[in-house]
Amino acid sequence: MALTPTFSRAPDIAPAPKGIIDPATGRPIGANDPTFLSINDELADRGFLVTSADELINWARTGSLMWMTFGLACCAVEMMQMSMPRYDCERFGFAPRGSPRQSDVMIVAGTLTNKMAPALRKVYDQMPEPRYVISMGSCANGGGYYHYSYSVVRGCDRVVPVDIYVPGCPPSAEALLYGVLLLQRKIRRIGTIER
């Protein structure tokens, strides 16, 4: 007896997703969330959502931040670790770029010396607006161990405006990822058009 495949003209229909059912109500969890209910009602009535252009631009910008590495010392190792598969910063819409002209965010990680300060400013000036800076680690925040050295800038905020400070020596990859999430929250709160 040979096995022959049977073909049917009826379409295969997947069962409706149930999600996680709340045993008290018998409905999916979050089914009575007022935010999702209003979005669902608006989509059902009109077929589209209405929002302001500023909110749409802020939403798109927070989901597509491109960062440029400016690793000056040992903090750069944690910055590289943040982009590896264990933490995977790209799932938050935070992807690395090699050129300042394609970057929205610059992460200054490490000790900034007086000789390197003009190069940092030059790279910052090449970034398109709106641009953001994350200062990572004690050395970038305020000089760190080398605060009293004649050749060290006591904080990169003396050269470029800093939006987020990530403390630590070196800060962990989780701390830097939290700083990225804080930057996204700041962009949503302040906006990009006013900046």
Curated annotation (Swiss-Prot):
PROSITE patterns: COMPLEX1_20K. SUPFAM superfamilies: HydA/Nqo6-like (SSF56770). It comes from the Bacteria. Its EC number is 7.1.1.-. One of its GO terms (molecular function) is quinone binding. InterPro entries: NADH_UbQ_OxRdtase-like_20kDa, NADH_UQ_OxRdtase_20Kd_su. Keywords: 4Fe-4S, Cell inner membrane, Cell membrane, Iron, Iron-sulfur, Membrane, Metal-binding, NAD, Quinone, Translocase, Transport, Ubiquinone. Binds 1 [4Fe-4S] cluster. It is found in: Cell inner membrane. It is a peripheral membrane protein. Pfam families: Oxidored_q6. NDH-1 is composed of 14 different subunits. Subunits NuoB, C, D, E, F, and G constitute the peripheral sector of the complex. NDH-1 shuttles electrons from NADH, via FMN and iron-sulfur (Fe-S) centers, to quinones in the respiratory chain. The immediate electron acceptor for the enzyme in this species is believed to be ubiquinone. Couples the redox reaction to proton translocation (for every two electrons transferred, four hydrogen ions are translocated across the cytoplasmic membrane), and thus conserves the redox energy in a proton gradient. This is NADH-quinone oxidoreductase subunit B. It comes from Methylorubrum extorquens (strain PA1) (Methylobacterium extorquens). The lineage of its organism: Bacteria, Pseudomonadati, Pseudomonadota, Alphaproteobacteria, Hyphomicrobiales. The gene is nuoB.
